[in-house]
Every structure is written in structure tokens, then in C-alpha cells.
A protein has these predicted regions:
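Canonical tetratricopeptide repeat
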Residues: 88-92, 126, 160-163, 194, ...
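Structural marker of alpha-solenoid helical repeat scaffolds
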Residues: 79-82, 116, 150, 184, ...
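Register position in tetratricopeptide repeats
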Residues: 62-63, 96-99, 133-134, 167-168, ...
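Terminal, low-structured helical/coil segments at or just beyond the last alpha-helical repeat
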Residues: 25, 40-44, 260-298
Length: 298
């Protein structure tokens, strides 16, 4: 007996991250790692066609031959349509489709996998991530609420649920979610980070910067440094903002919003040439030109 192979998570995982959360800079969270699809220790009969097809799919996955891997997994499902392990295979198919930008197909396959294993928390996390990519925020929220009912200790669902609520202006729900995280884990950096976004949303920039600092001192990230820099810009602590922006760019030189922050800094310092340079850099890193200028009031 062997275990069903799953995707190498570094190759084709669905994580809730800065790209698929689509938050504005003011409330964009750090990435949250999501575990691999489901249990990878389900025993199967190695003598069956089902296993042989899965083994072929795994070989393709190792070579990042996603379409061929998908073909073998679909053939495995067709060979044993009532096999409960098909939930895992559908999840792998959905993950590969998500990596290829085939979001509607990924959504359909995650949903079929959930129909087989309705309480699989990781599948619900992954479907919620696709809903976010598709701007179906209400449906993503519903999946996170379902996760919270299944597993009260799942802090990632509460954090992302709270961040989505905050992004829609619902600070009350966000506060409840972050308080619930503190109830589960009084020392949670995730809750402290969420509180920082709440303070920033309310215009309480000094309090927000303090919350971000507590998390940065333990685990610095480009996102948190950029958000703290934004708070420092709002309170005219320009030297502190400059340092955070420089450190954020070292960690993530491809984030266009960090160049926008530096453009704002240069505008406040009346360095117009440097401001224009940073606007161009933000555009070169993928930000729409009109949006870039609007963000710094140009």
C-alpha cells in the first residue's frame, strides 16, 4: 500500500497572499500560508489502474507538466468515480488550474472536492482564496465563516475574515475577529497585526505604528514595514518613513506600492524629480499609470 501523491506545495500551492487579497495598501495583510490540500496518507491499492494513473500524474507534477498531470488525475477519477480519495485528486487539479490562472475551473473543482469532503478545512481555505481572486468576497466570507464553525481554533480564517471585513469598511466585524484570535492565543502576532490595520483604518497612526512595530520586531516583512512607513508619512516622521521604505524595498523590490510610498516621501520633501522617478518605477512594476498618480495626489 502506498500513499496518494499530492502536489509539492512549493510548486503549486494556493496561498492567501498580497496578490490575491486585492487590498489597498492601507489594509493589505501579510501572506498567510495554507497547508497542502488534504491528508496525504490515504492508503490505496497499488495494483489498480487508479494508482497507476495517479503515479503518472505525480511524475508530471515533479516536472511541472501541469496539463498532462491534470489529464492523468481526471482519468483516475473516471476509472473509479466513487472513490472517496477523488476529493484529493480534484483538489490537486484545482490547485494546478489556479496556478495557470484558470480560476473558474479551479473554483468548480474545489467545490466538487468539498462536496465529497464537506468539512475539509484546507479545501475551504483554498476555495475562499479563489473567490477572493474572482472578487466574490461575500462567498469567500461564507467559506471562512464555515471554517470557523468547523474549527474554532483556526485563526487564519478569522484573520482573513476580519481583513476582508475591514477592507469593506466593517471595522466592528474586524475587531470581533481579531479579539477572537486573542482569545484563542493571547500572544498572537496575527491579532496584533490586525489591530494595527484597525488603528490605521481609524486614522490612529501612532497606535497603528506601535502595533506594526511589535510584529516587525519579531518577524519583519515588506508589507508591515510599508504600512508602518505609511503611518510615519501621515505623522510627518519622514526620516523613520524613509528607513522603513528602504528596508521594505530590500525585502521586496518588485512591489509597486512601496515605490508609491517613496514618491509620497519625496513629494513631502519637495524632491519632485525623485518623486517622478518613483512614479515611473511603480508603473514599471505593474501599477496603472493613472492609479499611480492618483495615489499621490497628482
Amino acid at each position: 500500500m502506498l500513499a496518494i501523491a499530492i502536489l509539492a506545495w512549493g510548486q503549486a500551492g494556493v496561498a492567501i497572499n498580497e496578490q490575491n487579497m486585492k487590498f489597498e495598501r492601507g489594509v493589505k495583510p501579510d501572506p498567510i500560508k495554507v497547508k497542502p490540500p488534504v491528508d496525504n496518507t490515504i492508503p490505496i491499492d497499488t495494483s489498480t489502474v487508479y494508482f497507476a494513473l495517479i503515479d503518472s500524474a505525480q511524475q508530471c507534477i515533479k516536472l511541472e507538466q501541469w496539463q498532462q498531470a491534470e489529464h492523468f488525475l481526471l482519468e483516475a477519477i473516471r476509472s473509479e468515480p466513487s472513490n472517496p480519495s477523488n476529493s484529493l485528486l480534484l483538489s490537486n487539479i484545482a490547485t494546478m488550474q489556479r496556478q495557470q490562472g484558470r480560476l473558474n475551473e479551479a473554483l468548480r473543482n474545489y467545490s466538487m472536492a468539498i462536496d465529497i469532503t464537506p468539512n475539509a478545512v484546507t479545501l475551504l481555505h483554498n476555495r475562499a482564496a479563489v473567490y477572493i481572486l474572482l472578487d466574490s468576497i461575500a462567498r469567500a466570507q461564507a467559506d471562512y465563516e464555515r471554517i470557523m464553525m468547523i474549527d474554532e481554533s483556526d485563526v487564519e480564517s478569522r484573520y482573513t475574515h476580519g481583513m476582508l471585513a475591514l477592507n469593506m469598511g466593517d471595522a466592528k466585524t474586524a475587531q470581533k475577529d481579531f479579539n477572537d484570535i486573542l482569545r484563542i492565543n493571547p500572544n498572537s502576532g496575527m491579532a496584533k497585526q490586525g489591530q494595527g490595520y484597525l488603528h490605521k483604518h481609524a486614522g490612529e497612526y501612532d497606535k497603528a505604528a506601535q502595533c506594526f512595530s511589535e510584529v516587525i520586531n519579531v518577524k519583519p516583512s515588506a508589507t508591515l514595514l510599508a504600512n508602518r512607513a505609511d503611518c510615519y508619512l501621515a505623522t510627518k516622521r519622514l526620516n523613520d518613513a524613509s528607513l522603513d521604505i528602504a528596508n521594505a524595498l530590500e525585502l521586496d523590490p518588485d512591489d509597486p506600492y512601496i515605490y508609491i510610498l517613496r514618491a509620497k516621501l519625496n513629494k513631502l520633501r519637495y524632491n519632485r524629480n525623485d518623486m517622478e522617478r518613483d512614479i515611473k518605477l511603480a508603473i514599471a512594476h505593474g501599477l496603472d499609470a493613472a492609479e499611480a498618480r492618483a495615489m499621490i495626489g497628482e
